[in-house]
């Protein structure tokens, strides 16, 4: 009981009526959360200011309908409401551009995983590792049907095989598709990238804690679009090497 009270419980799955992001597990997602919170601060200030101005104008006009009849323009107020929003937009845009660049930058990956979207499952290739038969480690990942789910497994999220990766390792995901456009998205890792036929897109992740992270195809791709979950297990390096030796 004492251990449970002193443990940090992370939310890495979608929750009913959820109103916020899943907990972050990578620096990129942490930056996205921080940017969102900062922007919301300015948005609430703008909402309050605009609401107050609207209320004041409506109240004043209702008391004296001809109060502003002969006012054609106000140079000072026009300058203010032109410059002030421009400054706010710059304050919001500058850090967002920095974050966008950092999310797009792939920094010296220690390993590469290729994710291929197909109707309606994912195929993964660990191109840096070769098994005893001289073949690249690869496997397919299918959603577990609802009637085969075990206790603790999640409907439309759990898969028969998981992508296993080590923590604190720069990982590059190379994403493509074999038929139609899919989308490789894992919210807790800050990953969302298109999987397009004939095109290779890449995104990086530095997972900073162990856990199981779920994602889904985020591009409508046909009848069973909802049956393309993504399950990534982040484990310690020794556990990853042990899993790799079993492949």
Swiss-Prot record:
Annotated Cu cation A1 binding sites: 182, 217, 221, 228
Function description: Component of the cytochrome c oxidase, the last enzyme in the mitochondrial electron transport chain which drives oxidative phosphorylation. The respiratory chain contains 3 multisubunit complexes succinate dehydrogenase (complex II, CII), ubiquinol-cytochrome c oxidoreductase (cytochrome b-c1 complex, complex III, CIII) and cytochrome c oxidase (complex IV, CIV), that cooperate to transfer electrons derived from NADH and succinate to molecular oxygen, creating an electrochemical gradient over the inner membrane that drives transmembrane transport and the ATP synthase.
UniProt keyword annotations, A-Z: Copper, Electron transport, Magnesium, Membrane, Metal-binding, Mitochondrion, Mitochondrion inner membrane, Respiratory chain, Signal, Translocase, Transmembrane, Transmembrane helix, Transport
Organism encoding this protein: Kluyveromyces lactis (strain ATCC 8585 / CBS 2359 / DSM 70799 / NBRC 1267 / NRRL Y-1140 / WM37) (Yeast)
InterPro entries associated with the record: CcO_II, CcO_II-like_C, CcO_II_C, Copper_CuA, Cupredoxin, Cyt_c_oxidase_su2, Cyt_c_oxidase_su2_TM_dom, Cyt_c_oxidase_su2_TM_sf
PTM note: The signal sequence of COX2 is processed by IMP1.
Name of the protein this chain belongs to: Cytochrome c oxidase subunit 2
CDD domains documented for this protein: CcO_II_C
Residues in compartment: Mitochondrial matrix: 60-78
The protein's required cofactors: Cu cation
Entry's transmembrane regions: 39-59, 79-101
Subunit (UniProt): Component of the cytochrome c oxidase (complex IV, CIV), a multisubunit enzyme composed of a catalytic core of 3 subunits and several supernumerary subunits. The complex exists as a monomer or a dimer and forms supercomplexes (SCs) in the inner mitochondrial membrane with ubiquinol-cytochrome c oxidoreductase (cytochrome b-c1 complex, complex III, CIII).
Disulfide-linked positions: none
Membrane topology label: Multi-pass membrane protein
Mitochondrial intermembrane side: 12-38, 102-247
Cofactor: record remark: Binds a dinuclear copper A center per subunit.
Molecular-function annotations in GO: copper ion binding; cytochrome-c oxidase activity
Cell compartment(s), UniProt: Mitochondrion inner membrane
Signal keyword on record: yes
Recorded GO CC terms: mitochondrial inner membrane
Any Pfam family matching the protein: COX2
Binding positions for Cu cation A2 per the UniProt entry: 217, 219, 221, 225
The family this protein is said to belong to: Belongs to the cytochrome c oxidase subunit 2 family.
Secretion signal span: 1-11
Keyword Nucleotide-binding attributed: no
Binding site for Mg(2+): 219
